[in-house]
Amino acid sequence: MAKGTRFINFRRYGRFGSRRYRRFGSHKSVRKIPRGVIHIQTSFHNTIVTVTDGRGQVVSWSSAGTCRFKGPRKRTPFAAQIVAADAIGPVVDQGLQRAKIKLKGTGRGRDAALRTISKSGIGFTSVQDVTPVPHNGCRPPNKKRQ
C-alpha cells in the first residue's frame, strides 16, 4: 500500500500550526535614545555593562556570564570587550549618539570596555570614575598565598 499524505488536525493546530509556534510582532515601538549613560562595573571576577537612558531606565545590559564566559575567563580583558560590544549593539541601532560613561571598580576589563565603546562611534560627554573608596572602613580580604 502506498504512503498517503499525513492527516493534519486543523481543529487542534489551526490553519498555520499551533499558537505556540506562531510568531507575533511586538507591539512596542522602538524608542529613539539620543543620549544615555553607560555604566561599566568591573570586579576581579566579572565585568557588567549597563546602558540607561536619560531618566535612568535600563535599555540594555550584558555581563561576562551572559556572553557565555565561564570561570577564570570572565575576568579577562577580552571578555570585557565582548561584553561592551554586546551591551551597546542594540542601543546603537536605537540611535544613541552621545553618552556619559561611569566606571566602577578596579578590574582588568576597564580599559578594554572603554576602548570598545569608543570604537563603536558613540561620543563621550564625560568619563567619570565612581569607584567607592573607603575612608578606612572594612578590613580588606587577605592576599592569596602562593
From Swiss-Prot:
GO annotations of cellular component type: chloroplast; ribonucleoprotein complex; ribosome
Primary residence: plastid
Location relative to the cell: Plastid, Chloroplast
One example GO MF annotation: structural constituent of ribosome
Region (Disordered): 126-146
Family the UniProt entry places it in: Belongs to the universal ribosomal protein uS11 family.
Assembly and oligomerization: Part of the 30S ribosomal subunit.
Protein name (database record): Small ribosomal subunit protein uS11c
Native source species: Jasminum nudiflorum (Winter jasmine)
Gene: rps11
